[in-house]
């Protein structure tokens, strides 16, 4: 049986990336709370470095 999680980097960036977060009010709230908490990576694309840009 095939498992449900079949990872794709492009899909991951597009759904959970920095620009996607910035595009909605709640997404910006997510980024703000992660900044406040001091997270090392704010979003998937920012964690991927230059590959996500």
Curated annotation (Swiss-Prot):
Polar residues composition bias: residue spans: 42-53
Top-level taxon: Bacteria
Annotated keywords: Ribonucleoprotein, Ribosomal protein
Molecular function GO labels: structural constituent of ribosome
Pfam families: Ribosomal_L34
Coiled-coil segments on the chain, per record: none
Keyword Ribonucleoprotein: yes
Record carries keyword Ribonucleoprotein: yes
Family annotation (InterPro entries): Ribosomal_bL34, Ribosomal_bL34_CS
Any one of the GO CC terms: ribosome
Compositional bias per record (Basic residues), positions renumbered to this chain: 1-19, 26-40
Residue numbers spanned by region Disordered: 1-53
GO biological process: translation
Similarity comment: Belongs to the bacterial ribosomal protein bL34 family.
NCBIfam families in the record: rpmH_bact (TIGR01030)
Protein name per the record: Large ribosomal subunit protein bL34
Source organism (scientific name): Chlorobium phaeobacteroides (strain DSM 266 / SMG 266 / 2430)
Gene: rpmH
């Amino acid at each position: 049986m095939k498992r449900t999680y079949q990872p794709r980097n492009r899909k991951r960036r597009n759904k959970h990336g920095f620009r996607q977060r910035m595009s909605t009010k709640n997404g910006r709230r997510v980024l703000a709370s992660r900044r406040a908490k001091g997270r090392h990576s704010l979003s998937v694309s920012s964690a991927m470095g230059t590959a996500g840009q």
